[in-house]
């Protein structure tokens, strides 16, 4: 089998590339996905409110685990990643958050990455998006990804939580993806107007599936990339239960889009990485590239949970006898509780003046429950997810076996810097201040977690060690740049090799201030133009907020 391009991974970026590259009818593309189809009749991935279900099984989730995390009481921590058409956009929380303009401007300070500034990237965010309330300087109106804006009046707790943030002295913002990210306000989500999850399989692949120049293979687990000297010329994979490898050649390029965990793992299995690691598994070294799998970053978060005195939380929706009605409303009308991911409000703040842009993120949820659906509090409650945004801690992804079915060794080194501890202590104390504002007086009961007895630095630290969890935002393991630990250049091309690019969240040099999906899609759009040899979209002229000397609180 011969194709112009072979794309490994049908996730948030891979589906963008598959769709854009096949817009040229003379370009042939093979898209390999280790998971299965995105079954449209499966409520677990299609109903926004059911977002916890895919994380509980292995049909749609790789369900990785970390090595024992040394600063987290040696816990082995969850590291869920999407498996199936759509990748992690098929199982994520659907929060559409782009990050802060300063994140991208910071990337662009690196020599060779000047074209990754916010104003260079904004046109690609807009190109990807159709926002339900219409386009403006920041938002698109005719892109493949449906973005829905929360409507006032869905749940009084959302408005009360935003108002509490404002009463505590923080800004209000009408659009966390617009002129000013800093502050509290409504949180956009990747949901269609019909109340369905807007994964990249739905948004992008649906328009490309019927094209004769696109071949999609599901249940196709990539074993390794085939090289002729220093040039990537094809891919070998295992299909279904078969132990006999399938093979295809790429006339132009192999495009690796397997995500921050699997992309470095595939490179290492293919002989690209740290030679010392490769020799442990008798893998012939194709290219010595020590940064492969290093620079692993994530967002860590925790929940502050409160009893709700008024019966307005989503607690009744967790009772089985209420779920058939919720399901029917969603299935037949695309409305009701089922049509929302329930992360309808949130915010970004600076915990201290030394941060030039927000370093703490909030998601508000009108029920007290773990993200993966476990440990639901059996009463009316609400909670605040809070975590730091740009931790200095760095980890790695390293091969443990040549077997493509084997998971790699994943270590985030969460909380390995003093800055991490300071930010989490600040975050808990600030959150308590916000929760004690008058806007929440009629709703706020006792603090369920951490519990009011948890006050000293040592007590807060122990709570974080035992209870903080991943926000499922791994990135950085094939970082873009030109230093000795960089893996790809500013166009995604792997240093020292030909015919091979990485295009996914692994190329982010530094993690962004917010959820990763929107920016991963943007990276796919921007790289698609580079691969096609097109002129980049014209730079935006939109203005954006820079805090400067503005106080953290008013």
From Swiss-Prot:
Pfam families recorded: GMC_oxred_C, GMC_oxred_N
One term of GO molecular function: flavin adenine dinucleotide binding
Classification via PROSITE patterns: GMC_OXRED_1, GMC_OXRED_2
Known catalytic reactions: choline + A = betaine aldehyde + AH2; betaine aldehyde + NAD(+) + H2O = glycine betaine + NADH + 2 H(+)
Record keyword Oxidoreductase present: yes
GO cellular component: membrane
Cofactor: FAD
Enzyme class: oxidoreductase
SUPFAM superfamilies: FAD-linked reductases, C-terminal domain, FAD/NAD(P)-binding domain
Active site: 473
Ligand binding (FAD): 4-33
Keyword flag Acyltransferase: no
Pathway terms, separated by semicolons: Amine and polyamine biosynthesis; betaine biosynthesis via choline pathway; betaine aldehyde from choline (cytochrome c reductase route): step 1/1
GO BP terms: glycine betaine biosynthetic process from choline
SS bond partners: none
Annotated family: Belongs to the GMC oxidoreductase family.
Functional note: Involved in the biosynthesis of the osmoprotectant glycine betaine. Catalyzes the oxidation of choline to betaine aldehyde and betaine aldehyde to glycine betaine at the same rate.
Name of the protein this chain belongs to: Oxygen-dependent choline dehydrogenase
Name of the gene: betA
């Amino acid at each position: 089998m011969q194709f112009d391009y072979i794309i490994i991974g049908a996730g948030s970026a891979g589906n963008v590339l598959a769709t854009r590259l096949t817009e040229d009818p003379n370009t042939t593309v093979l898209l390999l996905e280790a998971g299965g189809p995105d079954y449209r009749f499966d409520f677990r991935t299609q109903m926004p409110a059911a977002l916890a279900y895919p994380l509980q099984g292995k049909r749609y989730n790789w369900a990785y685990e970390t090595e024992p995390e040394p600063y987290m009481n040696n816990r082995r921590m969850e590291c869920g990643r999407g498996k199936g058409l759509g990748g992690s956009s098929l199982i994520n929380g659907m929060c559409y958050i782009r990050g802060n303009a300063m994140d991208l401007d910071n990337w662009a300070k690196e020599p060779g990455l000047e074209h990754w500034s916010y104003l260079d990237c904004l046109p690609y965010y807009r190109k990807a998006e159709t926002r339900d309330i219409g386009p403006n300087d920041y938002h698109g109106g005719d892109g493949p990804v449906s973005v829905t804006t929360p409507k006032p009046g869905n749940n009084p707790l959302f408005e009360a939580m935003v108002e509490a943030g404002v009463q505590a002295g923080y800004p209000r913002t009408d659009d966390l993806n617009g002129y000013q990210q800093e502050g509290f306000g409504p949180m956009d989500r990747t949901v269609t107007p019909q109340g369905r999850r807007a994964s990249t399989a739905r948004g992008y692949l649906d328009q490309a599936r019927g094209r004769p120049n696109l071949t999609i293979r599901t249940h196709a687990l990539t074993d390794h990339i085939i090289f002729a000297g220093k040039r990537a010329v094809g891919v070998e994979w295992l299909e279904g239960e078969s132990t006999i490898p399938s093979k295809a050649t790429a006339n132009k390029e192999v495009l690796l889009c397997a995500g921050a965990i699997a992309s470095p793992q595939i490179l290492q299995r293919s002989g690209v990485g740290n030679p010392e690691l490769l020799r442990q598994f008798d893998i012939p070294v194709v290219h010595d590239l020590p940064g492969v799998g290093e620079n692993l970053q994530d967002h860590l978060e925790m929940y502050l949970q409160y009893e709700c005195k008024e019966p307005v939380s989503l607690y009744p929706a967790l009772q089985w006898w209420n779920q058939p009605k919720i399901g029917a409303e969603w299935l037949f009308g695309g409305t009701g509780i089922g049509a929302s991911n329930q992360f309808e409000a949130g915010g970004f703040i600076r915990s201290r003046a030394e941060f030039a842009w927000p370093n703490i993120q909030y998601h508000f949820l009108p029920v007290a429950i773990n993200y993966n659906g476990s440990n639901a509090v059996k009463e009316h409650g609400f909670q605040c997810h809070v975590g730091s945004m740009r931790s200095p801690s760095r980890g790695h992804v390293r091969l443990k076996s040549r077997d493509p079915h084997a998971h790699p060794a994943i270590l985030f080194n969460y909380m390995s810097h003093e800055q991490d501890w300071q930010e989490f202590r600040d975050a808990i104390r600030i959150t308590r201040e916000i929760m004690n504002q008058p806007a929440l007086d009629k709703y706020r009961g006792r603090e369920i977690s951490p519990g009011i007895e948890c006050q000293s630095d040592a007590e807060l630290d122990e709570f974080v060690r035992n209870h903080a969890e991943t926000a499922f935002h791994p990135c950085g393991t094939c970082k873009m740049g030109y230093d000795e630990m960089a893996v790809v250049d500013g166009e995604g091309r792997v240093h020292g090799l030909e015919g091979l690019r990485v295009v996914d969240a692994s190329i982010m040099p530094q993690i962004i201030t917010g959820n990763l999906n929107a920016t991963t899609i943007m990276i796919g759009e921007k790289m698609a133009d580079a691969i096609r040899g097109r002129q980049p979209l014209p730079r935006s002229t939109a203005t954006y907020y820079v805090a400067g000397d503005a106080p953290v609180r008013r």
